[in-house]
Amino acid sequence: MSLPLKPLTIDSNNKQLDSKQKKFRANVERALERFDSVTEWADYIASLGTLLKALQSWSPKFQNVRYYVPSPYQVSRRLTSSLSPALPAGVHQKTLEVYTYIFEHIGLETLATECNIWIPGILPLMTYASMSVRSHLIELYDNYILLLPQTTLRLLIRPLISSLLPGIDDESNDFLPLTLKLIETLQENLDDDSLFWQTLFLVMTANKGRRLGGLTWLTRKFPSLNAVPHLVNKIKMEAEENPSETETNDSHLDRKKRKEEAFKVLLPAAKDLVTPEPGLLIRCLVGCLEDENDILIKRSVLDLLLQRLRLDSPVLNVLITSEDKKLLIMSCCRTTLSKDMSLNRRIWNWLLGPTAGGMLNNNGGNSMEYTTSVKSANEESNVYFTKYGLSALLEGLSDLLSEEESVLTAFRISMAVMDRWEIGSLVIPELFIPLLYSSEKFKQNEQIMKTARTFFDNTETNIIWGKLFQELEDIKNLKILDFVLTNFNIGNDEEIIVRHLPLILLTLLALPSNDKDFDNIYKLQKFSLYNKLLNYIPERALLPLSHSKLKHDDEVSCEELLAKIRGFYTNVSNPSSILEKENIAERLPPFTTEDLTFLIADLIQKKLLSSLWDLENINESSKLFIAIFEKIPESEELKGRSHISWSDKKITQSIFEAIPRLCESNNDAKSEEIVGIVEIFGNYLYSRMEFIESMKLLKVVMMAVWKSLKDPRHQILGVKNLKTLNRFIPSKFIESALVYTFVEEEDISERLSVLDLLWTQLDSDSNLIRRPLELILGELFDDQNPFYLTVSKWILSILNSGSASRLFYILTDNILKVNRLEKERLDERDDLDMLTYEFQMLAYVLKTNNGRTRKVFSTELTSIKSSTIWKNEDVSTYKSLLLVTLMRFLNIKSNTHAKSIRSALILLDILLDGTEQNFKDIVIFLLQMSSKYIAEEGIEPELIAVSLLDIVSKVLRLSHDNGIKLDIFDDNAAHLKYIDFLVTSVSNMKSPLIVTAYVKLLSESIVYFENSIFRMILPLSASLVQCVQRLFLLEKREGGYYQPIALLLGGLEELLEISHGYLVTEEREGYFSGSNLKGDFIQSVVSNVFSSDSSNEESKIQGERDVILQSFRQVISCCLDIWYWAHNISCKSNDDSSLDATNHNSYKFKFRSKKLLETLFLLEPLELLENLISIRSDNTTVTLVHVLDGNKPAITIPHLLYGVIIRYNRTASVKFSNRDGSRSSTTKLTKGEPSMLKRLSGESIIAFLFNYVDSVENSAMEEFYGDFLLFFREVATNYNLYSDVSLSILKLVALISGKVSKTQFGEQKRVRREISDVFFKYLPNAFINFTNLYRGHPDSFKDLEFVVWRVQYIVNDQIGGDKFNTTLATIVNQCLTPYIKPKSEKTIPGYVLELAAVVSHLGSKVKSWRLLIAELFQNDKKLSVIGSDQTWEKIIYEWSIYPENKSKILNDLLLEIGSKRSSVTPTLITFNLGSDSEVEYKCQNLLKISYLLMVSPNDAYLLHFSSLISCIFHYLVSKDIKLKGSCWILLRVLLLRFSESHFNDYWSMISYCLQTNLQEFYESLQIQSEVDPQTILQVCKTLDLLLLLNMEGFTSTNEWIFVIDTINCVYKTNSFVALVDEIAEFKDYEITKTDDLELPTTLKDGLPLLRGIHKIERHTQLRSFFQNLSYLHYEKVYGLGSVDLYGCGEDLKKDILS
């Protein structure tokens, strides 16, 4: 029910007045005018005295004429301003004197009707009134305000309570009894205890400044809300007497009845506190427990809870909702986080009930009785908490686990409740797993993980592992166990690792895995978990298997095992069990240690047997099996053997059966499973098996190892297996098994491949390789053997790899072992047949490879240690050592073994070459001896082909060496066939043998091509490249093609190197010297096939150059493919150990391709670099270039710079250091153009150059600085030619300047000056065509940003220096101004703004920039368009804080509006408003001020606050509608951008402006005059924001004027004067219209009700706002809602700019 409001127009009514009244009115108006000129507090007293005299100048003479106050709103406003906190007590005293006079004369009835005019000014005074003022104020309350009618008191109840509570917040206050008496009087006069209490709770919830006073009142007056015992007993007796009445099926009726019963057991006074809304009490208590409150407030609230609102109160368990109860309990628990013991003790006692508090105070008495009572009290407390608090606490904590922000709180509360065992023992078991899951979910948050670890360490271990066991058994979630083992402190807790982890391991092993869904997860995680658990379990947690009475053939049920473990953990971790029993630590585990050890080992063995049967996870199973047996202690008598209770037969049998199946499988994954079998056999079974059985099994295992040794994809795996066997089994047995597999293998290439692998992978002192080596070398004994050539080529590869010494050592060591050199006579113990064999073997080895082996043998230094047996003889090389050995052997007199002598002589013949020191003596001694051997061709096609190629090669070499002319072919058909053979034959080659021979032939042939090579190099190189690519594809699919690819790349390298040499010679000499040509058959072949005439020598040379470069391009592309592939694999292998073999291979490919690229780089650096850039210009290529130039940028950069110059200025004469002098002649081929000239842009080269320089270390800048400076000077001189790439060049300059500045070299004045000088020469022309070239190119502006950040390094000047500013000004004028012209209508792209934002950081002293932004800020249209952009906000803010602008901008805007600084308090300044354009201008300036404040931080313009708010008040009480709208916006900006404390002096004026504006609108509705909807919208939005922000100065004592501020807003049973609700009752707002605003139904999101509404057509569209504001604001306070300040700010910005 709304009350009528006194209209504002009463101030200027035109009713008939007599002369005395007119004089009375005039006196009052004159007195009011005096307030306009006050400057200090004394003026206020004088003005108030004048006002009092004016009010006393008339009194009614007749009883029917009542006293009145002229212009009551104006008088009230002046009185309110006189009660400002800034004024002294004397002014306040005088003001109260005036108030007293007015109240006394107008009477209570008039005061009640005009309460909205007179009461608001008095209400805030109690908060800051001095002692002298307070007594007068109390009298005013006592004599007038509190005597108002009940209807008035009901609408004033909240502001009155708010105004009186500050008077009782200090209990030492002298006026405390009087103020308490006032509140009692208020409650009594109100005659509505329910409304009183509900409003009190609302005040304490919304206004934190009133909470201390509120608690003072509650402590004295709050009735107990606990159940009264005798009333409870009475209800119980009634229920027992009438059992039928207690039963009902209707839940609603049942709930209603329960509430009625709850009220029956409470004190009568308690009902008023919880009706109609019990939730208000809870919110009041919760609000008082928030962190922001003083500790005294929290302590008082907790005392209230303990004494008058226990946890078992019917209010908490019946009358309020479960959500409210949860809210209260969680607030209490959050309070424990402050770790104040005085608070925590109260909270625990409240949660545990009255017995807990008594228990703490119980001292003395009989100890036995005391112990019993404590135990009883404990049990009672637990029952109490379980019944009344546990579920709410658990639910509240669970709610916290869903959001990352609140998980930390949940952990901390959980740790806090551990302090009270009675609570913790109930809460932690229930929450442990959910807390773990939440920490796993947010494990990236370091703070959460740190807290989770602390929580884990503090939790009782039985609870941890009991709950984890339950989770494993019920949900089979291995992930959470893995998370615990990985992230928490497990290893340092003795109880965990000894007692619990073995049980958890047994649980995991016993869990069934037949469920398909579970099985997939299980397979992924189980072995990892087994190993993690085993790593933690110490040896002392296990006992020898022999100690257990269990046997391997005992049937053990996994279900039984799990049931026993379940029973154990149920006992030790279940809360109910914990409470019932004592001595948890002493409870027995489900198994003895010895039985537990046996069960774990038994189940792991079953896992292994299962894996061997399925051929899956054998490696993991075996690793686990070995790990457990390494961990289990062994009895002394059973060292290395199994106890009789244990059997390994099943494992042995399973391995015998599994290996053949593994060997038959073609699955790569299965092939790797052999590792586990090898590990089991070597590390476990071998020592426990019978010898014969172990040898049988070793042979079978070696067959599987042999298979992996043969497979190129698993060779490294095979070697690893071999090494594993060698670690556990004597070498002689392994060697025997290995030789067996060698003999069984029929394919010589496979045997050789394995031998080569073992040669490279096994240690040089390994004996495993000797016997297989002898078997392979045995193939050399017969040169007609089809495998002879294969073995000899392998020996050649050994020589090439640099490991010949190892081969020679083995061969000579075998001879020395048999031949005892110190003997002069032979006896029957000497094995001459073996010696003969060793002699023959070495002889056949030395005969291989056309004497190459012999040559290396002759020069290779021996590694055999010196000994006395050698005396003074030379044994430094293997040749000299063997010569000494042979001579000694031949000198033995009694040797009748002709075969051994003959073998020695053959070997001697091979070694002798005439260079020996004792050559003559040897020849004389062996004069009668000779040796012969016969060489015949092979029989297989491959070997025939190789032989043919070798013959041709040999003929070519010999003819060249001896100058012999070969005229084998006479007709052109033969010539063509030869060339065609070279080009086409390579296309089908695969075998390394054939490729080796082909490359050798090619190498011999190149010598004869000479100048004709230019006509055949292209098809020849193309054919070679195609072959490499074909083999490379096979390599990627199958592997094993490294050798032929490497040989072909070597051939290509030689071909290109020699052909390029001919080109260089030709370019130097201009022609070939014909007299030096060798007239051989290849020359004539090439000339006949590719003859061509050239009329012009120069064009001929250019054509030849093009051919060479085209070949280069093909080879570069091919090499890059190989290098990139190898590089990617080597990168991946760092993360994946399974790629070891592939990685080993990739390094070989990478090295070989790099070697060829290095050669090409030496020959044609620029050509190679440009091809690299065109193929792939990324960071990998930059890495490759660093590899090629050896991390010496001075080699690479000049070529790249030259590549740029030649594309833009071919006539340039720049001479870079390494292109013209310092390098060999091959690096300065500048006669011809690069082949990529038209296919690769200069922009691309500069982009690559930028990335390359960026990757170079700063210290390397000095190396190429001179070349870079030459380049920059060239660009600056011919700027017009380089205009297309000017920005890229500037970016490069910026990068280099930045890097140079960070070096010692860059500290030299010359260096810093040189770049700066060239830059300033270039700067005026660098951006001439910028807008044309780069319009719409975001990247170009990113590049400019890069440059701008580094300008200080380029110009060698500090930020703000003259050079720096000049550069920035140029960039602004030429690059930014065309886009940011204030008069331009086009939208400014985001990338331009990003650059502008960078300039704004650095350009505080750049005049053109400052003027540009100033002009834009002054342009109203442009600002409204750009202002909403966040980047623009940063720019405007940066501009506004420049030293020249910081205070000037706001001062200028205020000056233009016409404001001036306020005096002691806000006063009115007269503004003469002119034309509409002037008003519009002022509006725009007000909005600019608003925008400027919004883009600035809070309190940035604090010095201007007084002027700003004064300006606002002046216009808000004026008549200008448009200015009012802008001022309301500015007021909202101040509310968001300045701290609440700065408004303390101004709340009354803010309230007055809001009140008068809304009341004018209200009266306009009544008389149906015209209303400006936009102004009303802004007024409403301001009120909306004020209510949302809940600023105490406004809401506590002024809110009631505008909205219904009590629970009456819901029911509206009491009268009200709230303007918003008064307006809502107007008839225009009764009918719903289609254009009504759709407003939200809640304020939970923290945004105003009118968010997003910036313009309306009619005021009636606000119908929903007026009707719902009071209720929604009440709901927001009730819901303890927060405020979204950012969202409010964004909405306000749209108001400013719309």
From Swiss-Prot:
The keyword Phosphoprotein applies. GO terms for biological process: cell morphogenesis; endoplasmic reticulum organization; Golgi to endosome transport; protein transport; retrograde transport, endosome to Golgi; retrograde transport, vesicle recycling within Golgi; trans-Golgi network membrane organization. Pfam families: DOP1_C, Dopey_N, TPR_DOP1_M. Its main location: Golgi. One of its GO terms (molecular function) is identical protein binding. Keywords: Golgi apparatus, Membrane, Phosphoprotein, Protein transport, Repeat, Transport. Disulfide bonds: none annotated. The modification Phosphoserine is found at S244. Interacts with MON2. Present with 2700 molecules/cell in log phase SD medium. This is Protein DOP1. It comes from Saccharomyces cerevisiae (strain ATCC 204508 / S288c). The lineage of its organism: Eukaryota, Fungi, Dikarya, Ascomycota, Saccharomycotina. The gene is DOP1.
